[in-house]
Regions:
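Edge beta-strands of jelly-roll/beta-sandwich modules across compartments, strongly enriched
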Residues: 68, 136, 140-157, 271-286
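Acidic, Ser/Thr/Pro-rich low-complexity intrinsically disordered segments
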Residues: 59-124, 129-134, 141-142, 202, ...
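Non-catalytic extracellular/lumenal accessory regions of secreted precursors
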Residues: 26-66, 74-77, 156-189, 294-295
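Noncatalytic modules at the cell exterior or secretory-pathway interfaces
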Residues: 126-145, 252-273
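Beta-rich globular "head" domains
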Residues: 188-221
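C-terminal segment of classical bacterial N-terminal signal peptides
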Residues: 17-25
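Sec-dependent N-terminal signal peptides
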Residues: 6-16
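Solvent-exposed serine/threonine-rich low-complexity stretches and specific carbohydrate-binding patches
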Residues: 102-115, 168-174, 221-223, 231-246
Length: 297
């Protein structure tokens, strides 16, 4: 009876996972595999990477390992998600490449995420930064667990995107271009420290930058300027002239962290003095949820 209750509890947990698992849409392909994939040579062929296909595994009590292989296109950064229940404590999972090199490993219960929810899981990162599609293997080992085991595997994107708008305090002042320099005159500098801003994901990389502000009096031939001050000493000038807004050539290839000190000033050609207040910085970013405990911001 105790064994029946344990199996029933495990199956109920699995039903909860299937009901609320984020990648299992109505049209998703859910395949049940009843063991038999105990080595690399006999690995279940998952096929090409897809976020809509998942595997429900029934691992017989006389088998220690479950192996699965899949292909991943170039320039993809993904993760494999393995469901977990308390009955499976001591199980562990591994990610390996086609040369059997270990890429990532997670162990229960210490590496289990969302343990206090109905869908605890373990996650394995997989990066294909090569120039072609590659084959990868996942190995699930029962550890010291006894009896038949039940778990679900799925694949998910790791790279997410987001954006935020932040306000500089203070007012930038420009003395005016009294010498009528063709280079114009820069204003005073405003500074904004986003180093510990909790609304920005850890490790977020900037993909675009824009600014806005209110100049008084409003003038022509004004360029906003921005500096990612923690990582660079180079000021970026807006790609167009405007007293109210600026846009910049900064993108993900620059690898600037969103969480850093940003500085702002503006350049004016006009001879008259001016000020700019209500200056805002808008950042778009991408981030790897492997750096956030696999949580989205």
């Amino acid at each position: 009876m105790k064994r029946f209750k344990r199996i029933l509890a495990t199956m109920l947990a699995l039903v909860c996972v299937l009901a609320v698992f984020p990648t299992m849409e109505a049209e998703a392909g859910i395949v049940t595999v009843n063991g038999g994939c105990t080595t690399r040579a006999t690995a279940y062929n998952w096929g090409a990477y897809s976020t809509t296909n998942s595997i429900t595994v029934v691992l017989p009590e006389n088998e220690d390992d479950f192996w699965v292989k899949f292909t991943l296109p170039k320039d993809k950064r993904v993760y494999a998600r393995c469901s977990y229940s308390n009955e499976n404590e001591s199980m562990y999972i591994e990610m390996r490449n086609s040369s059997n090199v270990l890429l990532d490993a997670k162990y229960s219960p210490e590496d289990v995420l969302d343990m206090d929810t109905v869908i605890p899981f373990m996650a394995l990162a997989c990066d294909n930064l090569t120039a072609s599609t590659q084959t990868y293997y996942i190995r699930v080992n029962r550890g010291t667990c006894s009896g038949t085991m039940y778990f679900t595997l799925s694949m998910n994107e790791r790279i997410k995107t987001g954006r935020g708008t932040f306000t500089f305090s203070g007012t930038a002042s420009n003395p005016g271009n009294s010498s009528i320099s063709l280079s114009g005159v820069d204003s005073s500098v405003l500074s904004l420290n986003l180093t510990n801003n909790s609304t920005i994901p850890p490790g977020a990389i900037v993909t675009s930058v824009s600014t806005s502000g209110t100049q008084s009096p409003s003038q022509g031939n004004v360029h906003h300027m921005i500096l990612p001050a923690t990582e660079s000493s180079i000021w970026y000038t807006s790609t167009y002239a405007s007293a109210t807004s600026g846009n910049y050539t900064i993108n993900s290839t620059d690898s600037f962290a969103a969480r850093q000190v940003w500085q702002f000033k503006y350049n004016a050609l006009a001879t008259a003095k001016s000020t700019m207040k209500s200056v805002k910085l808008t950042l778009a970013w991408e981030y790897d949820i492997a750096n956030t405990g696999y949580k989205s911001y």
